[in-house]
Amino acid sequence: MSEIITAKHSPRIDNNIFYWYEHDTFAIQLEINLIAKETGEPIVVKDTDQMIICFYKNNIPIHKFCYTNFNNGHKFVLDFSHEVSKKFTEGTYEYRIIYVGSNKTTIVAKNFAEVEKWVIQI
């Protein structure tokens, strides 16, 4: 009897790499808790502040998510709709998260995402 090999969960984070399959559509909620280095106190994200998540392939910008109005705390949703997902072909991407409050601060740099090819073999 033959077995069907199942796909790995998509999207997923494994060894600090964000994976998903090419053409997948999904929404993933992120929550970022910022701590002031000087005081050790939490930084309160204001409604006027901004989070920018940028994806690059070979240092070429692929897509940018921008969020304001943080009325739900420090949470925001990356919506990989059909329009967004089709920008991401198989391969490795770098992503960065920038917080813009009273200052502009890179809070995540040189993290990686891997878009995997799905192949149907008969």
Enumerate the language-model features and the residues they cover.
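Contiguous segments within soluble domain cores/interaction surfaces
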Residues: 1-122
